[in-house]
Amino acid sequence: MSSSRALVLGAGVAGLTTAIALARRGVPVDVLERDAATAPSGRRGAGSWYRDGAPHAGQGHVFSPKSHQVLADELPDVLRQLLELGAREWSVGPSAGRWDGPTSAESGTALAVRRPVFDWVLRRVAEREPLLRVHSGAAATGLQTSGGRLSGVLVGRAVVPADFAVDATGAFGPVSSWLDDLGHPRLAEPRPDPDTASTGADFYTRCYALHWPGEPGELNLGLAAGGDFGDYSCRVVPADNNTFTVMFTVPAGAPNGAGESRLAPLSSPDGFQAAASSIPAIADWVDPAAAEPITGVTSLRLPPVRRGGASAMARLPGLVAVGDALHTGDPVWCSGMAVALASGLACASAVSAARDGETVDVAARVWDAAADLAAYPACACARMSGPSAGDLAEVLAGSAPVPVG
């Protein structure tokens, strides 16, 4: 492997983690980020920094004990700055609820922080690295190959030479289609487990601020509150500075009319508040006496998740995927941040070793680091009794009273 600069495509969590770790191992690295927006200069803007390339950033993100451990061990300055900005650490145990899938919900020290705050800190840390350059508004448009391996990345009509690049373009990035265009066949990916695979979902999210520190309700899921109510789920995810996020997840094609037509009113502030207030596990959190909303309702539709693997990265030598580009898990499992951090750090470690002359299978090392995290939920979603989707639809339609107390 030559000593030219490494390229990272995408400045999200996985991309910047990879880039920071590469730079700190002495590898010069350029990050190509299609979004032109740069991080706000002041700390006050951290909580409201939303990038077009991360439409899901408004959702509640769980930074599990494994995520926290990675930060403490490998990026302690990032963790320190997050805590200075109001992120919270707290000890959690396994979920008390029943989980019908894999049973390894995590225990340990977790981190409560909003995704925009995390993104802001990570970008600021990256921009201070002497060997790292973030190019905002530089959209990669294709790949160039020579002799059967990567030789460069296209940015418009220009070619940026590279013998190694990291695909951190996310779950629905363009790299796979670029490889199709170059004639590199797709490799078979693992068949989804019908018991755990997602069919896609609609997400409705709103952020609240508590009037005082603490939790007004039980965190019955360890890292969150709420649960799975059959045709939908609803969770409270604690965050920094006494804020929290409430998120409804409505699976695509859900039975009993739980689809868009009946629950679409969740996208309105009044409908969202009424629905959240009708769920006993959530009601205490959104009680106006305890908290007030600080954002509108964000609606987002995600297609079915894609189960990746090491074989999916073997299409073109010199190109390795990290984060969601490597493996897109069901958002309900809350393992995305851990996979992004672990795969990025493993990639940097393997690339650095290869540049030092070791014989390293970079793709295999990256997948090994992510595989265990991708296979199990960080936060189980307990099956709970509560309003059905039909009950929720009636609340949204205004035909049922909102329970009080």
What are these regions (language model features)?
Residues 62-63, 105-124, 174:
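Short beta-strand to alpha-helix junction loop
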Residues 349-405:
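C-terminal helical "tail/cap" subdomain of flavin- and related membrane-associated enzymes
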Residues 21, 39-95:
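N-terminal FAD cofactor-binding segment of flavoenzymes
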Residues 128-281:
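Predominantly flavin-linked oxidoreductase catalytic cores and closely associated redox partners
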Residues 4-42:
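N-terminal Rossmann-like FAD-binding beta1-loop-alpha1 element of flavoenzymes
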Residues 252-365, 369-372:
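FAD/FMN-dependent oxidoreductases across multiple families
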Residues 82-117:
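Flavin (FAD/FMN) cofactor-binding and adjacent substrate-gating region
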